[in-house]
């Protein structure tokens, strides 16, 4: 499909009750489901949470569309499925990958998905599946994910995400979130694209509580952007693909499913520029817990325990006195999947490059490599700015099982443990 070059418009805020109409008066006034909707549209509700959730937790959007979503033939299971569907046995070993190679054959967003790891089947209301995407052509079909909410983290190439509620344009250093069940199409603006995805099977992502930080800081609500209504009135045949319990199913439509003329609600897609994150850090000593870098979180029923946290390590000043400044050596209850969008990560002098990834599972010891450690111990502790960098982490409370495909890819580094092998004992009981 041809890309529409019309400049995109957005609405600002997080968790708002938004409304938008592409034609004047398309939104009903004072009710959701009138006997006759304006312009001959059909009213349809998209529920992102159960009806009886607390009002503060409820997610739903009313859509006013040209053709109801219910008008479709039976779905058929596709022969080509997502790579990495088969999970391997759990491993406590630390894993790291080089950037995955971009495809040589024409590959759209769906065909270029590789599941890296997961910790829950799609029929459970908790857990996360982690993917990388590799593409070199725009989608000519539409897709929705019945298994979870999608958090997209581009690393290479700009994307235009054409959704039922409007279009989002995202580039590396921005993220996008698409609600469970929302139909969309991915168009490539730069020819090739690579990035990461967290498929959240649990509670919808929200901003973390700030506690003693106060009422401002980290990701500020006004910097999240939601699209305005934008519809396609096309009667050309089109394939609609859905992901259902981990498998791809498809049917053929006689119209575009991106035909929503007006809508209102809070179950919406959105984007966020990571460069607007208000980074918090120490101005005295020690390295605070990395939870201070949390952008979004999906909570569990246990207070403070996340189903998934999305954490970034952005450009920042390091000023701590008498302190080992890199992230410390660590054994964590949580499971950490990391990626790198640009630059270098301050705990790894080499081997972890943009487009790469790593997985440190529950209680797997990790921390700065030997070179980074030696430099930090000997460093002159002047104020130092870590610049031109953006690493991130998907942190989850359930153990991640890598996929068989992720363990068999040539990008897997078989010598990852070697980065700590040259750490030597400097213990001297005679000298404090």
From Swiss-Prot:
The keyword Transmembrane helix does not apply. Homogentisate binds at residues 345, 366. Its cofactor is Fe cation. The active site is at residue 287. One of its GO terms (biological process) is L-phenylalanine catabolic process. It is an enzyme of class 1 (oxidoreductase). CDD domains: cupin_HGO_N. Keywords: Dioxygenase, Iron, Metal-binding, Oxidoreductase, Phenylalanine catabolism, Tyrosine catabolism. InterPro entries: HgmA_C (IPR046451), HgmA_N (IPR046452), Homogentis_dOase (IPR005708), Homogentis_dOase_bac (IPR022950), RmlC-like_jellyroll (IPR014710), RmlC_Cupin_sf (IPR011051). Fe cation binds at residues 330, 336, 366. Gene3D superfamilies: Jelly Rolls (2.60.120.10). Belongs to the homogentisate dioxygenase family. Hexamer; dimer of trimers. Involved in the catabolism of homogentisate (2,5-dihydroxyphenylacetate or 2,5-OH-PhAc), a central intermediate in the degradation of phenylalanine and tyrosine. Catalyzes the oxidative ring cleavage of the aromatic ring of homogentisate to yield maleylacetoacetate. This is Homogentisate 1,2-dioxygenase. It comes from Pseudomonas aeruginosa (strain LESB58).
